[in-house]
Regions:
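Conserved glycine-rich cofactor-binding loop
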Residues: 15-16
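Substrate-binding pocket helix/loop in short-chain dehydrogenase/reductase
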Residues: 98-99, 106-108
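Active-site loop-to-helix junction immediately N-terminal to the catalytic Tyr of the SDR YXXXK motif
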Residues: 102, 148-156, 168, 196
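Active-site helix of classical SDR
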Residues: 122, 158
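Alpha-helical segment proximal to the catalytic Tyr-Lys
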Residues: 127, 171-175
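Residue(s) in the substrate-gating loop at a strand-loop-helix junction
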Residues: 142
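Short, flexible catalytic-loop segment of classical short-chain dehydrogenase/reductase
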Residues: 185-195, 199
């Protein structure tokens, strides 16, 4: 990334462990941050924190389970901040269990957060990036989306779907100067990991 040029960066799950680390890093490089998180209080607090440090940020709180929120978020960011140069689909849900323990709710919620929300956001942002001459999209998948771990069937399945979707999108839109990639972190010490797994991982800033 060229740190000499300010970009508008939209981050989902922006107030969680990895999300907040991404927000702070991009803000420190002079970028304008669109903070998308389900917690209205935390989203505005994080935006205020960045502004107090001399950075640029705006809060766009909402629930990724809400299709209207997903479909309209990019438009709202575009109107308020003027562009979306980078979209980071960071929000995620981890539910533990094998197939005998996984519930319909586990599967449906995980698919909506881990797969459908990125799908809707990307579908909405592609025309904006195309019109602007390009952009970058990053999907936060997981190493378990590539090499599944034990006792996390639903999580591994949805992250594998996100990784496959990323590969398809990358091929389809490279000619529009839109880079679409997935990052597949190992265990990172975040609240989501602590609720779904016993192993303590790296810190988000590492």
């Amino acid at each position: 990334m060229n740190n000499n040029k300010s970009r508008v960066v939209l981050v989902t799950g922006a107030c969680g462990g990895i999300g907040k680390a991404l927000v702070n890093k991009y803000a420190s490089q002079g970028n304008t941050i669109a903070i998308a998180d389900k917690s209205q209080e935390q989203a505005h607090f994080l935006a205020d924190e960045i502004q107090k440090r001399g950075g640029k940020a705006a809060a766009f709180p909402g629930d990724l389970l809400d299709k209207n929120y997903c479909d309209n978020l990019t438009k709202e960011v575009q109107i308020k901040l003027g562009a979306i140069n980078i979209l980071i689909n960071n929000a995620g849900l981890m539910r533990r269990g094998d197939i005998t323990q996984a519930t319909d709710e586990d599967f449906e919620l995980s698919m909506k957060i881990n797969v459908e929300a990125p799908f809707r956001l990307i579908r909405a942002v592609i025309p904006l990036m195309t019109k602007a001459g390009g952009g970058s999209i990053v999907n936060v998948s997981s190493c378990w989306g590539v090499n599944p771990g034990p006792n996390h069937l639903v999580y591994c399945t949805t992250k594998a779907a996100l990784a496959a979707m990323t590969r398809c999108l990358g091929r389809d839109h490279a000619h529009q100067n839109i880079r679409i990639n997935a990052v597949c972190p190992n265990e990172v010490n975040t609240p989501m990991l602590r609720t779904g797994f016993e192993i303590r991982g790296l810190n988000p800033d590492d």
